[in-house]
Amino acid sequence: MTEGKSIINANLTPLPDKVGVDGLEDKWRAVWDEDGTYKFRNTRDRKAVYSIDTPPPTVSGSLHVGHVFSYTHTDVIARYKRMRGYDVFYPMGWDDNGLPTERRVQNYYGVRVDVSLPYDPDFKPPFEGTDGKKIDAKDQVPISRKNFIELCERLTAQDEKLFEALWRKLGLSIDWSQTYHTIGQHPQRVAQKAFLRNLARGEAYQQDAPGLWDVTFQTAVAQAELESREYPGFYHKVAFRFEDGTPIYIETTRPELLAACTSLIANPNDERYKQYFGQYVYSPLFKVKVPILAHPAAEMDKGAGIAMCCTFGDVTDVEWWRDLKLPTRPIIQRNGRIVMDTPDWIEDPAGREVFAETAGKTTFSARKIIVDKLRESGDLDGEPTPTKRMTNFYEKGDKPLEIVTSRQWYLKNGGTDAKLNAELIERGKELEFHPDFMRVRYENWVHGLNGDWLISRQRFFGVPFPLWYPVNASGEPDYDHPITPSEDRLPIDPTIDVPEGYDESQRDVPGGFTAEKDIMDTWATSSLTPQIVTHWAEPDEASQALFKSTFPMDLRPQGQDIIRTWLFSTVDRAHLENKCLPWAHATLSGWILDPDHKKMSKSKGNVVVPNEPIEKFGADAVRYWAAAARLGLDATYDIGQMKIGRRLAIKLLNATKFALAIGREDENHHVGAAAEAAWNPADVTEPLDRAAMAKLAVVVRQATEALESYEHSKALEVIESYFWQFCDDYIELVKNRAYGTPDEHGNVPSEKAVKSARTALGLGLDAFARLLAPYLPYATEEVWSWMHAGSGSVHRAAWPVVDPYVEAATGASPELLTWAGKAVEQLRKIKSEAKVSMKTPILSVALSAASEGVDAIHAALGDIAQAGRVVGKFDLVAKHAEESAAEDAPETEVAVEASELGEPPVKKPKH
């Protein structure tokens, strides 16, 4: 860089008499909106664009500081990349479909869906907000599916406004013209188009199979949505009997499933049961004949070592049933209750009577009946013993999952295809994880998949499958030959739209058609966010240009807890559809913990609403707290950190105002006139100023390297550490020289020395405004406006490069500033220990330090003497390494060997 290019020209404005962070958010947010500061231009090629796959928050959830935490991490990177010259594509989406939204709408309006009801265009809900109270299903008003969807859309629109207001106040540099809703027309079109292409390639398929089922939400649940929780229960030792009445005992926590038993299973290597393999026993109470079989998945050390296989009690039952080709004997309905009709396989009259007593009962009630009957029959050995077992729950549910057989849609994800599994592992190796140790979580998940991705849900508010089925002459749907629309018709709702070649009168009649009534899992849409925001496969030129310049995307920021759901499913979809990764980098944030180091959650009642700390401390302060946390690690909600962030923002304002006011103040210390300045590195001539610039060059280099590696907290630490040193040491050391103030002997600093200090101050604070801009967008914009009036936003300014500061340093060591700071610290210590004013003169002093320290201090002796008010003799004593060691003092320390204080200044009387 030439000398001319290194010069920073400043247009200085009048300065406010008082500075503070209050009011900055509203002031600058309005300017950013008016100027389109964060708008994506899309005028350049892919290499000049940085695109972010922003997480669309679930708007049905309540706002909490966890949102502020992770989204700040993303915004720091977005702002940094924009300052690096990239055209940043930073959209925002709203995840507004799925079960959480439905549950919120049910409670908010007091309604539930009854698909048999017609649409009522004049419907008014019985409630308009219930203060978070849950309304029992029996008290909810039944409405049509269409009425329910309208209420979902109405409430999510309200919720989205709250989220947007928070994001804007926090200062997220989002392009608000680039927003989407996962239930909107465009995302629906993308999701349906991708599904139809998956179907055409054989990657999507439907199957009647046993699957996990949530009895509360009445829907199938995918493996990725499971949550293993400890659940209390009882072990029951139950006798099955051979033909001659000899018992063989199993232990079960689910005796209510005895009627669904198909076999007894033991490990083939279990010597206790080898003799029985191939023999038959009869189930207690129901007298159903079942075989004793071998399977390697049977655990010899669990319970009695032999277990009953029912259809279905858990996923192990499914494995045994599939591997051993056992009969299907389901007795649990989708509502979680025992079937009403006694099954045909129970032939014993007494057994049929027992079953009739359990018909229609919940599993809990049925269990009690069966246990009582087992006691009466003598088939219960001893009393049930308490136990706690890990049980599968739907992550949003509060009852254990059942396994029921139903027709569902699946998407291949490597769970049943070894080749695809290996390909997805390789995709994970291509992806840059930040932090890198998160990669193993992805790989463990992919390796552990035991089935394809179940993508259908038996709910209402979501993206419909774009399918119909022919209805045969007997009125049965032909699920093997789905009717699909052409892509140009998308999006469609098959419950409203009619397939080509049919008319509405043929709906649900023999020889006509019927709609697919299931909807897609919300993750089936969210997994396509890169394709949604980049307008994949849209026919218009603008969309094609957008896709070309933004896909594959650069960054996916997200929480560590949804690697298995969102991150993996997005990789799967891009691999199947685009034959590439959806993005190059993934950043993973940790969780927010409360002050007791417990994860914040609504159920625990320890959630903090984010508006509170923003109102109290300011957006910059809250952003500072969030940005100080390292990726991948949990962080504590810490108002102490926010106070530090607020203090940092205020210090930036005060330090910048102080430096810019030098030489411009009137007698009342008011700066009312504009001015121009040229901060030329060649004008930095004094050793201390050069040392400050040398350290600044190091900081710029380290901060840049950290942000390039997505280590935002490391960059902040480096910048902040030097900022405080710059303010506390450097400014204090040079302020007298910068003002041209004579020393204690009346010596006036030269114009060259004055200019050197003022130039270094200008270069330094200009750099800090830009270095801190990604973290403190409001305070930095304010000080930038004082320095560079009319030049636009600091957030569109160039990120600092080392060249001007290297040029200004001209080979100086940054350690000179460190030594000078330590020397001043010792001079202050003399006065603080004597309990006198810092304005008290020092008549004489002798400081000792290592030889390199003495040289550094000597180079800045004039500034140090003025800062410490040394008016007399100032001696420096060089200590050798062995002396420091003998005195147990670090070689980097400065010590006072002797000093003499003058008289403290007389306090002026208060008027």
UniProtKB/Swiss-Prot annotation:
Q: Which InterPro entries match?
A: aa-tRNA-synth_I_CS, aa-tRNA-synth_Ia, Anticodon_Ia_Val, M/V/L/I-tRNA-synth_anticd-bd, Rossmann-like_a/b/a_fold, tRNAsynth_Ia_anticodon-bd, Val/Leu/Ile-tRNA-synth_edit, Valine-tRNA_ligase_type_2
Q: What class of enzyme is it?
A: ligase
Binding of ATP occurs at 602
Q: Where is this motif: 'HIGH' region?
A: 57-67
Instruction: Recite the UniProt keywords alphabetically.
Output: Aminoacyl-tRNA synthetase, ATP-binding, Cytoplasm, Ligase, Nucleotide-binding, Protein biosynthesis
Q: Which CDD domains match?
A: Anticodon_Ia_Val (cd07962)
**Subcellular locations according to the entry:** Cytoplasm
Q: What is its main location?
A: cytoplasm
State the reactions this protein catalyses. tRNA(Val) + L-valine + ATP = L-valyl-tRNA(Val) + AMP + diphosphate
* GO MF annotations, alphabetized: aminoacyl-tRNA deacylase activity; ATP binding; valine-tRNA ligase activity
Return the annotated region ranges for Disordered: 882-911
Comment text on domains: ValRS has two distinct active sites: one for aminoacylation and one for editing. The misactivated threonine is translocated from the active site to the editing site.
Q: What is annotated about its quaternary structure and interactions? A: Monomer.
Task: Give the similarity note.
Answer: Belongs to the class-I aminoacyl-tRNA synthetase family. ValS type 2 subfamily.
Kindly provide the name given to this protein in its UniProt entry.
Valine--tRNA ligase
Record organism: Bifidobacterium longum subsp. infantis (strain ATCC 15697 / DSM 20088 / JCM 1222 / NCTC 11817 / S12)
Q: Which gene encodes it?
A: valS
